[in-house]
């Protein structure tokens, strides 16, 4: 295991492995390795080019070559075989052996100066979500005095892709400010989003009392303590901070909608609970910074509620209102409209062919793979009761669950995926049901898990 780690840090380079001296704490600090890199590998580079290489070596992940601060030097580095390219030849990074050696030459102050230059660069260009995280990495690494506020800005909307970066970056910030209640609060929020119970519990213990309410609610859901969750919700409805009340009400309503299975009869208790949670939301007191995201979340909940109550006209109005919130909401509007199409299919208002065509178009328009798979999974669930063969054909178009993706949204998708698979694989039915139950519990969907446990026991 130690040899593998050393090999990884030296980029797997055979000569570097031979030159490695075990008396050094880090492989790249070996004098022989450093001399080899400087005197042989980088012998054709001048000081300015080495300075540019240092900047590229400080990037945390492969980046788009044209967006690099040192894009003018990429060609030179490539000719010298100093770079490692992604399979599509778009993203680039410095070969790991060279990167680690260049970093080892820099003291902490020099590294901070480079991070500062890079943060200024990334701040001044148009960025993707991933590049937002690169910017945040450099801002934290340069010791930016506003790092708490900068992290908070990124927490307004936590996507699955962002949560991976944020979890790491917040821990990095905590190494610099371990006593920061704000940072522990942010870490707990991301852990709740990723359904990471042990991490959530750890950080809750380091948060100021008045900010614990919403996180204790999330913890109760994730641990399957629905009665405790309801008690926590009721106790906090008179919270002095209306923003906290709004967040808890939106979260409770959304979870109640999601905590069910597709072939379950809609009961009045579910509808009454969702209406109760929605009634606690005061839109006039939504924080300006999160108002847009909160309005979208509320509209999505109301859209789901309208379909549960078979009010297709209301559902259409809600999907149109989401579309009016800007370009970023267009993909979400397609998701809502696809649910309306499926509703019409189940009520014999449109044909299967029309529905599949609409779903195919909606899926192809999505850039988020979780969204696209969720759209098709909705169709699979609708087809199972009356055309199991066609449902299976659509199911085969879905990606299999991936272990490295962590978010409550994705876990709910995976739980539904396993439930659907139980219908198509009779010999694996019990295994699929057990997996669906387990993932439903991970996502905090206790009611759905209990229903499936009853089914499992009846089969056994």
For each of these PLM feature ranges, what is it?
Residues 400-460:
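C-terminal non-catalytic interaction modules
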Residues 134, 186-189, 214-218, 222, ...:
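"A position-specific structural signal for the A-helix of alpha-solenoid helical repeats
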Residues 139, 191, 220-223, 260, ...:
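Residue at a conserved register position within TPR or TPR-like alpha-solenoid repeats
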Residues 35-105, 112-120:
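C-terminal boundary/linker of central alpha/beta nucleotide-binding cores
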Residues 115, 149-152, 164-174, 196-207, ...:
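Alpha-helical repeat scaffolds
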Residues 1-2:
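Conserved small helical "lid"/interfacial subdomain of P-loop NTPases
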Residues 30-32, 41-50, 99-133, 144-167:
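A eukaryote-biased feature capturing mid-to-C-terminal, repeat/solenoid-rich segments of large proteins
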Residues 9-21:
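The conserved phosphate-sensing helix
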């Amino acid at each position: 295991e130690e040899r593998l780690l050393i090999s990884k840090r030296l980029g797997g380079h055979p000569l570097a492995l031979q030159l490695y001296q075990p008396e050094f704490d880090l492989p790249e600090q070996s004098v022989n390795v450093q001399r080899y890199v400087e005197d042989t590998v980088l012998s054709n580079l001048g000081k300015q080019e080495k300075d540019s290489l240092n900047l590229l070596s400080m990037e945390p992940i492969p980046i788009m070559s044209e967006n690099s601060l040192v894009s003018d030097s990429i060609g030179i580095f490539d000719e010298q075989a100093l770079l490692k390219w992604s399979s599509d030849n778009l993203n680039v990074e410095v070969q790991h052996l060279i990167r680690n050696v260049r970093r080892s030459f820099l003291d902490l102050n020099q590294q901070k100066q480079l991070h500062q230059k890079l943060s200024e660069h990334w701040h001044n260009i148009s960025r993707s979500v991933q590049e937002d995280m690169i910017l945040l990495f450099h801002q934290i690494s340069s010791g930016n005095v506003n790092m708490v506020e900068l992290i908070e800005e990124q927490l307004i909307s936590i996507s699955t892709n962002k949560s991976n970066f944020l979890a790491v970056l917040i821990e990095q910030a905590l190494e610099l400010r371990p006593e920061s209640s704000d940072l522990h609060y942010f870490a707990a929020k991301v852990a709740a989003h990723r359904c990471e119970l042990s991490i959530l519990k750890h950080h809750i213990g380091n948060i100021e009392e008045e900010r614990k309410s919403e996180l204790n609610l999330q913890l109760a859901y994730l641990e399957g303590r629905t009665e405790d969750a309801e008690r926590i919700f009721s106790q906090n409805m008179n919270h002095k901070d209306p923003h906290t009340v709004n967040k808890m009400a939106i979260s409770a309503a959304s979870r109640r909608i999601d905590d069910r299975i597709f072939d379950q009869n809609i009961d009045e208790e579910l509808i009454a609970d969702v209406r109760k949670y929605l009634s606690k939301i005061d839109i006039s007191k939504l924080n300006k910074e999160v108002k847009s995201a909160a309005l979208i979340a509320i509209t999505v909940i109301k859209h789901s509620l309208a379909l549960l109550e078979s009010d297709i006209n209301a559902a259409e109005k809600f999907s149109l209102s989401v579309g009016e919130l800007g370009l970023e909401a267009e993909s979400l509007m397609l998701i809502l409209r696809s649910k309306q199409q499926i509703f019409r299919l189940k009520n014999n208002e449109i044909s299967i062919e029309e529905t599949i065509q609409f779903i195919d178009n909606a899926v192809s328009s999505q850039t988020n793979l979780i969204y696209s798979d969720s759209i098709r999974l909705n169709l699979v669930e609708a087809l199972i009761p009356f055309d199991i063969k066609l449902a299976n054909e659509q199911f085969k178009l879905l990606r299999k669950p991936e272990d490295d993706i962590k978010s409550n949204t994705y876990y709910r998708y995976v739980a539904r995926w396993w439930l659907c698979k139980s219908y198509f694989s009779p010999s694996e039915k019990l295994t699929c049901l057990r997996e669906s139950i387990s993932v439903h519990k991970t996502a905090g969907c206790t009611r759905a898990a209990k229903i499936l446990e009853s089914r499992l026991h009846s089969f056994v």
